[in-house]
Amino acid sequence: MCGIIGYVGEGSCRDVLINGLDKLSYRGYDSAGIAFIKNSKINVVRSKGRIEKLKEKINDNFQKFEIGNIGIGHTRWATHGEPTEINAHPHLDAEGQFAVVQNGVIENYVQLKNYLTVNGTYFLSDTDAEVIPHLIAYKQKHLKLQIVEAILCALSELKGNFSTVIIARDMPDSIFVYQNKTALTLGKGSNFYSVSSDPIALIPYTKNFIQLHDRELGIISISQLAIYNKGKFTYPSRRFKANLNDLITNKASFDSYTLKEIHDQKKVLRNLIISTLQSEKSIDESGQLHLEYKKIKNFQIIACGSSFNAALVGKVILEKLIRIPVHVYYGSEFKTNLPPLLPCTLTIAVSQSGETGDMLSAIEIEKSRRKFQNTVYKPYLLSITNKNYSSITKKTAQSIDLKAGIEIGVAATKTFTAQTLSFYLLALKLAEHKFTLRKKEINKHLDEIRNLPKAIAHLLIKDESSIKWLSKQLKEISKCFYIGKGLNLGSALEGALKLKEISYIHCDGYAAGEIKHGPIALVENNTLIITITDPEQSQESTFASSQEAKARGAVLLAITHIEDSSIYQTFDFIIKIPKISQICASITSSVSLQLFAYYMAYYKGNDIDKPRNLAKSVTVE
């Protein structure tokens, strides 16, 4: 739950580190720092708060030429210890021999810290990361090891999913990089090597990337990468190129990345449709999927956060179009509450970042428990992610690339709708192979899908100003419930999550019929009830649930494309969405709810791109 950057090259590392930290800031952070080697000394600069404070501190204390050609940087999201300067990375050992940045969690740090403390080590911070430099220094001193040996010895004692980058005072031309189930990417340029937890930090400087493997120690210098694994050094040539167009972004004329990304959706979904639909009336394999369609008898979807809500919509779509059971599980729950092992099951792992810690663990467990089973229990693994170079794509046999471009805003917007559309396209592809829909029916669905970007564009042009006005009227609301049925339940849960994330208003989402089974006890004057409704989802009972809340003082807001006088008689406010098919309407409804949440947060003066206490990429379990 942090960002890592490292650089060793011919010029000063200052700009690479600072610019890299800036680009990593979208992942969420509460403090930042850098360490660099100059004149046989490791210098560390850290600060709490925004990276601008760190820049000021660096500029106040060092001229650019005073910052050497090797350094590491870090944006921290507090998991162990409060968000303070003393807890910020990088961390040093007592003698200043080693500086370390770390991402992830060291599970046995308490035991190691106690052991080192008993043996005379004094710790300054409350973090798990500070154990690493002290342990390396201890091993080097007491076991009389060389630097590389001491680092390897220390790393062998650390338990958990983490990555770490280390510089050593007495090896001022090398950076040590190590990962275990928390990814690091190396960048190769002209006369330099770099490392980061996300390629976005490296793209201004290189197009060539190298993925480190788990439990490998990489040593990078100006011109060379060496990998130490199983007792020997190798010099690998494995490389990949990231899609730079997907990684480069700016706010353009928008006030925030989040608002820009809401507006990006018409283009994102159009691109996803074009890349998936091969011709006018067929579904393209596009080289992405080669599933054994007819063998699939069950689905299980694993996801977290907004991806989980997209999975709930996906469940309804898949069951509706393919008529096969679909089970949806939280990634965080899957590993501790394993569901029954079902035969002929396609497991779909959904993750925006492709680096979610709970998701990666869940996939490993699913693969492991099916490994030695009868062939009917063979693991069919498919991922849906926005980063086709991420860890999740390496752990699944097949992957669907959302092609949404990088999403800077912490709250998911375009990736949520792209995930939902991906489920729809996947369902049609499976329906075509399993003959659960006639060709004519599939073509009708495809025609509706092709109209979706136009419907979203229409909504953004016609309705944004009215949604903005409505948000201003309702900004003092302190409690909110979202309700919907079927396809709209996932949209309701996602709408509630969006409002909660960026406006900090307490809200929850429920199945419309469930509000009377407990939640209505919380309804009082000025409680806002947002109802997502359409004629095909038991409109009358949804209206009845809304009216029951209104009788207890609630303010009612409807998201709908229904043209009916009963809507105006029942609801206090209405957000109209374009008339479109039921499945596509669940996506356009989500865009309306994103705009509503955005402007509620806007009128509260919140930092919408970086809401409090949230991180974009949750790499810890």
Curated annotation (Swiss-Prot):
Coiled coil start-end: none
Gene3D superfamilies found in the cross-reference section: Glucose-6-phosphate isomerase like protein, domain 1, Glutamine Phosphoribosylpyrophosphate, subunit 1, domain 1
InterPro entries: GATase_2_dom, GFAT, GFAT_N, GlmS/AgaS_SIS, GlmS/FrlB_SIS, Ntn_hydrolases_N, SIS_dom, SIS_dom_sf
Principal localisation: plastid
One MF term in the entry's GO annotations: carbohydrate derivative binding
Catalytic residues as annotated in Swiss-Prot or TrEMBL: C2 (nucleophile), K616 (for fru-6p isomerization activity)
Domain of life: Eukaryota
Enzyme class: transferase
Keywords: Aminotransferase, Chloroplast, Glutamine amidotransferase, Plastid, Repeat, Transferase
Pfam hit, one: SIS
Domain SIS positions: 289-436, 470-611
Tagged with keyword Transport: no
GO BP: carbohydrate metabolic process; fructose 6-phosphate metabolic process; protein N-linked glycosylation; UDP-N-acetylglucosamine metabolic process
Catalytic function, reaction form: D-fructose 6-phosphate + L-glutamine = D-glucosamine 6-phosphate + L-glutamate
Residue stretches making up the Glutamine amidotransferase type-2 domain: 2-223
Subcellular location: Plastid, Chloroplast
The protein's Enzyme Commission number: 2.6.1.16
Record's GO cellular component terms: chloroplast; cytosol
Quaternary state and interactors: Homodimer.
Function: Catalyzes the first step in hexosamine metabolism, converting fructose-6P into glucosamine-6P using glutamine as a nitrogen source.
Protein name in the entry: Glutamine--fructose-6-phosphate aminotransferase [isomerizing]
Organism listed in the record: Cyanidium caldarium
